[in-house]
Amino acid sequence: MALFSSSKPIFLRGRLITGILSAMAATNVDYKQAKTIYEFTVNDIKGEVVSLEKYKGHVCIIVNVASKCGYTDNHYTELNELYDKYSETKGLRILGFPCNQFGSQEPGGNDEICEFAKRKKVNFDMFDKVDVNGGNAHPLWKFLKHKQGGLLLDSIKWNFTKFIVDKNGIPVARYGPNTSPKDLEKDLEKYW
C-alpha cells in the first residue's frame, strides 16, 4: 500500500484514515477466490483494523450477534463458557460481529454495543457492526456463506448464525441460531 504511505497519520472527520483504507482493501478481496479467512481484514469494535491472520493456528467460532434478540442471553452465556473452557487449553477464539439486519435487534452504535458486552462480561473478540447479507455484506461474511452454504439459500437467516473455522482458516461447519453454542463442543473436538 505504498500509494497511501505517509510520514504523518491522515485523519478524516477525526478518524484515522488507515482504518478506512484497510476496509477498502478488504472490500477488494474476491471472496469467491479466497482460500482462508486470513485474507480478510475487519475493524474491531473500537474501530482498529485487524488482519484475521492473527487467528492462524486457532480454531475459531465466527458469529453474528445482537443485543436485543431472544437468543441473546443464552448465546452470550454459552459463548463465554466455551471461551473460558477452551481458549487457554485448546486455543479457541470467538469472533462476534454485531449485525442489525434481523428485526433491528442491534440498533446501537459501537459504544453502546461495548457497554452491553461489558455488562454481559463478554470475554471474546468483538468487531464492528456489519451487514452479513445483501450488497453491503462484509466480504468475510460473503466468504463464509460461499464456503458453508445454508439450507435452501446461502443467506444468513437470523442472529447468532455460527461458523467453525479450522486451524488453517477454512470454514468447516455452519450452525443456525437454534443450535446452542454448547452443542458445538463435540464438533469443535474434531479440529483441535
What are these regions (language model features)?
Residues 1-25:
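N-terminal mitochondrial targeting presequence
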Residues 21-53, 74-75, 139:
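N-terminal "domain-start" segment that seeds a small globular fold
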Residues 44-45, 64-68:
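Amphipathic alpha-helical repeat scaffolds
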Residues 58-59, 67, 73-97, 118-121:
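Conserved helix-turn-beta segment immediately C-terminal to the redox Cys motif
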Residues 88-108, 123-134:
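Thiol-based oxidoreductase modules, predominantly thioredoxin-like and allied folds used
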Residues 111-159:
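Short, internal strand/loop/helix patches
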Residues 139-142, 146-192:
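Thiol-/selenol-based redox modules, centered on thioredoxin-like
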